[in-house]
Amino acid sequence: MISPLAYVDPGAKIGKNVTIQPFAYIEKDVEIGDDCIIMAYASVLNGTRMGKGNKIHHHAVLG
């Protein structure tokens, strides 16, 4: 489920069964694997590639 309060760039590749919580920020050149959780206020920046089953905690910045 992707929260309507999260920003996910249309160019990001999001896997199956991914949870993106409110106010998370996902940039364009990002790949998020299946079964990942992006918690509130986390940022995933351009060039980041995440495999399956990762959990990114509140306010974390990747990339």
Regions found by a protein language model. Name each.
Residues 6, 12, 17-20, 24, ...:
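A structural motif detector for beta-strand N-caps
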Residues 1-4:
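Short, basic phosphate-binding NTP loop
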